[in-house]
Amino acid sequence: MLKTLLLWTAVGVAGAAQAAPNLARHADLDLATARQLADATLKHCTGALSVLDRGGNVLMAQRPEGVGPHNLLASQRKAYTALSTKTPTRLFAERARNNPEAANLNSIAELLLLGGGVPLFAEGELVGALGVAGAGGAEQDEACAIQATGQVGLTIQR
């Protein structure tokens, strides 16, 4: 009886191990890299910044003294827009302006169609996003985000 019980237990465990799904593994943006991005951003400009992970969660948010308080939320929304669309926000805003069907995108509260948000890719995989606001305008915000991204070894395209 004990041998039979042990045999069925072994078969059940082996079967359970084989039935486990083969889930994909993904690179994750960690807090250390988010800090590096923040430091790199502030080397290139003085603006508020937000770093999001692949799920849209804030890993790092910072607003230097003298930068308007509204810019922190703007940086987060720019990062969220870049993450959601997998596109730099200035390019996305330009495309939206040229497409009448995209006019309603401005009504989605979480999106901000202004330059300064960039998706973050590691070896072709989306790992998060960086948003910059208050550095002197959309072009400056975007340039700052792109420079910081390159400095830490990430890219803004697949």
Regions flagged by a language model, labelled:
Residues 3-15:
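Bacterial N-terminal signal peptides
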Residues 19-158:
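Flexible, solvent-exposed loop/hinge segments and secondary-structure transition points
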